[in-house]
Amino acid sequence: MIGDPNQLPATIFSKVAESKEYDRSLFQRMQTCGHKVTLLDEQYRMNRYVSKFISDSFYQGKLQDNARIDDIIGNPDLYKNPSMGYLVFLHTSGNEEFENGSYQNMREVDLVVNVCEEIHQSTPSMDISNVGVISPYSRQVYQLREKLKGATKEVSAKVEVNTVDGFQGREKDVIIFSCVRSYTKDDPNHKNKSIGFLDDPRRMNVSLSRARLCLVVVGNIAKLYESKRWRKLIDYSFALGILYDMDGWKGHHGLPAKLDKFKITDIIKYLN
């Protein structure tokens, strides 16, 4: 039997079935009962910077890169773009909205589409169909697909947008992940709002491990910093120097200035 209990379980719609833990796979049940489990600890997909975070965060540091991972990844033209890299975190303070039973963030929608256009224009040698956009919320997926209809022909036709579940078991050269969840200081209930299943470690693991060459995360660090798991990614991004403040960015001219220590502290404390 082969499986990964650190990735998404079966989708359960029945509350009764959920109460009986029908979302637990046979693999998990056997593991819990003490059956021997062997970890396949070598990965051939992700670049070293992303795989290190995934390994440390979800596999106790046991996931190792194949010895030829740098040759497998190669040195694509994408890396010649100073705005891109192995891992990029884009901060934006756009507002979340609850529509039709799901969440959306229109500022993130605009930003994601602009990033797709930036990649297409700055790296013409790259097949834009190798760019995928993931969001955990169906409403955000809908809004992203609608917005992409107004993008340039190649971007509109070839960039795939889907939920986390829709991308499990798959990969793209570039993955852009839209976190959606955010808030503003004007919201009197902002301190009582969680980030929902965005904080689920299995969902986070799948979302961030689909990218081969470049992972771009779009989100509000002030909101995400409430989660220990997302705080770890934010701190890791800051340490690597790839955390950018995107508020006010219009696209097509490279990324704006990176966040310095004072700025990131200012953003995190803004809502306290």
State each model region's role.
Residues 1-272:
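Conserved helicase motor core of SF1/SF2 NTP-dependent helicases
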